[in-house]
Swiss-Prot record:
The keyword Cytoplasm applies. Disulfide bonds: none annotated. Its main location: cytoplasm. Acetylated. Acetylation at Lys-11 decreases DNA-binding affinity. The keyword Transmembrane does not apply. GO terms for molecular function: double-stranded DNA binding; RNA binding. This is DNA/RNA-binding protein Alba. Binds double-stranded DNA tightly but without sequence specificity. Involved in DNA compaction.
Amino acid sequence: MATEQTILVGKKPTTNYVIATVMAFNAGIKRVVLKARGAAISKAVSTAVMVRDRFLPGKVQIRDVKLLSDKVQGQGGRERTVAAVEIVLEMA
C-alpha cells in the first residue's frame, strides 16, 4: 500500500479537498501532500488547517510547507511565473 498521496488543489470547493484528505488518512495513507498554484493557494492552506483543527484534531500535523514558483505558458504563448505551494500533512 502507498504511504504518500498527492492532492492537487484547484477550482473545486474546499470541502471536496478536505474530504479527499480525510479519506486518504482513513484509508491508511501516512502522508498527504497538498499542491496548489496561484489563486488556489489559499484553498490549500484552508484545507490543511481544517483537516488539522476540525476533522482530525491531534492526529495530523503540518510537517512541511514549500513555497515555489512555476513557469507556465500564458495567453499568446508568453511565459509567466506563478506562485505555488506544497503542504505536507502527516499522521501524528
